[in-house]
Amino acid sequence: MKNPTMLKLKDKLLAVIEELITKENKYRFITGGALGTDQAACWCVHILKKKHPHIKNIIATPFKEQDKVWSADQKMWYKRMLNVADEIINVEELDKYKVSGEKPGEFSPAKMQKRNEYMIDHSEAIVAVYDGSKSGTRNCLNYAKKTYLGHQLWRLHPDFNFELDITYFVG
């Protein structure tokens, strides 16, 4: 990883995840495996497992061949990431998160949203890199607010040097 922005993000993610482990007693970390922040977060959890071997690094994929249209290099890193995960959950195979009318193993925006819903439904704290724009991240956070399960939102602002703010969703 040589991109200065991603290196800064990695440092911020390591600090946030470390705090979640040591101060909030979180030990299960679920990422979606997507390019960018998801993969950076997964690798950060992997790094922190050396110091905190009890934590779990879980990848929730929206569909089986998420990497189908990615470059050879992206596919290689994705496979490596899957190999270091403690658990891989293929969300489209779970009854509660199935999208009717969609072909198994193939991309659809609805499957991406269902993957996000799965991650929210199985989490107590959310770490989001979010700039406020209309996006899958916004949909994910709206779902979290709507379903209210006592979530904490640890938001890193990409437009402001990944400044952190923490919100506790009120039911």
Curated annotation (Swiss-Prot):
- Name the domain of life: Bacteria
Name this polypeptide is given: Uncharacterized SPbeta prophage-derived protein YoqJ
Chain's gene name: yoqJ
Family annotation (SUPFAM superfamilies): MCP/YpsA-like
- Record's Pfam families? YpsA (PF06908)
Q: Which Gene3D superfamilies match?
A: 3.40.50.450
Organism of derivation: Bacillus subtilis (strain 168)
